[in-house]
């Protein structure tokens, strides 16, 4: 059973709310860098950056982080049974910058732990904050987001799916019951 919990109109409001929270909690945004975790985190980062530019007239660099080699629970393997790497693309040096790490759903915290390891291999940021579109709870690691679009409590036998226009041809968030 699939249940829509956020439609496209509400999703736009969520992006605006996260953007305002980022503006309010940062004295200046000149040292900000948004880093999206592949795949949907990148699209979310780009949308927040676009909204920030509309509201404040400031362009924030947006980077892409591939955490494949840093995961402790899974790897995408290619035909040679090796991890499938897609590469990082961060347009600026993150050293001494305030990096806002962005992902779609925060669940156990393992993805974020892997992303923190990957980021630290790329430089030494002044500060790292975490923004997520959805916090569904059930943490296994002591990780807490700084910016949350929606808190959507779930059961362990449920899954949150985020649809993004860029790859899914529509926006929305659904909860699906697993078998």
UniProtKB/Swiss-Prot annotation:
Q: What stretches pass through the bilayer?
A: none
Q: Which UniProt keywords apply?
A: Glycosyltransferase, RNA-binding, Transcription, Transcription regulation, Transcription termination, Transferase
Write out the GO MF terms: RNA binding; uracil phosphoribosyltransferase activity
This enzyme catalyses: UMP + diphosphate = 5-phospho-alpha-D-ribose 1-diphosphate + uracil
Q: Read off the InterPro entries from this record.
A: PRibTrfase_dom, PRTase-like, PyrR, PyrR_bifunctional
Q: Which EC numbers does the record give?
A: 2.4.2.9
Q: Where is this motif: PRPP-binding?
A: 99-111
What GO biological process terms does the UniProt entry carry, in alphabetical order? Answer: DNA-templated transcription termination
Quote the SUPFAM superfamilies the UniProt record gives: PRTase-like
This chain's function reads: Regulates transcriptional attenuation of the pyrimidine nucleotide (pyr) operon by binding in a uridine-dependent manner to specific sites on pyr mRNA. This disrupts an antiterminator hairpin in the RNA and favors formation of a downstream transcription terminator, leading to a reduced expression of downstream genes.
Belongs to which family? Belongs to the purine/pyrimidine phosphoribosyltransferase family. PyrR subfamily.
The record's PANTHER family line, in alphabetical order, gives: BIFUNCTIONAL PROTEIN PYRR
Under which name does UniProt file this protein? Answer: Bifunctional protein PyrR
């Amino acid at each position: 059973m699939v249940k829509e919990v956020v439609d496209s109109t509400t999703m736009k409001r969520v992006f605006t709310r996260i953007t305002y929270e980022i503006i309010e909690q940062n004295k200046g945004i000149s040292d900000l860098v948004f880093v999206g975790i592949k795949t949907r985190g990148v699209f979310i980062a780009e949308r927040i950056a676009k909204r920030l530019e509309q509201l404040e007239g400031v362009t924030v660099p947006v980077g892409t982080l591939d955490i494949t080699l840093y995961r402790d629970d899974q790897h995408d393997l290619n035909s040679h049974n090796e991890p499938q790497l897609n590469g990082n693309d961060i347009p600026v040096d993150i050293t001494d910058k305030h990096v806002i790490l962005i992902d779609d759903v925060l669940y156990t915290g393992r993805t974020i732990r892997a992303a923190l390891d990957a980021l630290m291999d790329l430089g030494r940021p002044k500060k790292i904050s975490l923004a997520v579109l959805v916090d569904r709870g059930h943490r296994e690691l002591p990780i807490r987001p700084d910016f949350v679009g929606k808190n959507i409590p779930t059961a362990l036998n449920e899954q949150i799916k985020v649809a993004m226009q860029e790859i899914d041809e529509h926006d929305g968030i659904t909860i699906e019951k697993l078998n």
